[in-house]
A protein has these predicted regions:
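Alpha-helical propensity feature that highlights long, continuous alpha-helices across diverse contexts
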Residues: 1-117
Length: 117
């Protein structure tokens, strides 16, 4: 299922803000509001929404695998901290190695997307 660009952006914005709140509740406060987020973050969220629409998976495994592939294509690597300039991220690991809250976040992307379309 594909969405018109304006609908895709509306869903992506809502998913982004929900994930931002989820992350903040788990101590991760480095995700800016949608209107202040860089273009690469918008693109990443749109891609996550597209993926959720194309893959009806209840858990977040395929969502994480998609994110991991996207980051690797964009030159990101595993690193001890999230650093956009250095393109390192501590969550560039297999799904089974993610903290539980991160696995639940990936499933949340799928559930939110389906609820919003």
């Amino acid at each position: 299922m594909s969405l018109p660009p304006d609908h895709l952006d509306a869903v992506a914005r809502t998913v982004h803000e929900a994930l931002r709140a989820w992350a903040a509740a788990h101590g991760q406060r480095d995700i800016p509001a949608w209107d202040e987020a860089p273009d690469w973050m918008h693109a990443s969220t749109r891609e996550s929404v597209r993926h959720a629409l194309e893959h009806d998976a209840p858990d977040g495994r395929t969502q994480h695998d998609q994110w991991l592939s996207q980051k690797a294509r964009d030159g990101w690597t595993l690193g001890p901290v999230k650093d956009a300039a250095a393109k390192t991220h501590p969550l560039m690991v297999p799904y089974d190695d993610l903290p539980e809250w991160e696995r639940r976040k990936d499933a949340l992307i799928n559930a939110l997307t389906r609820a919003l379309v």
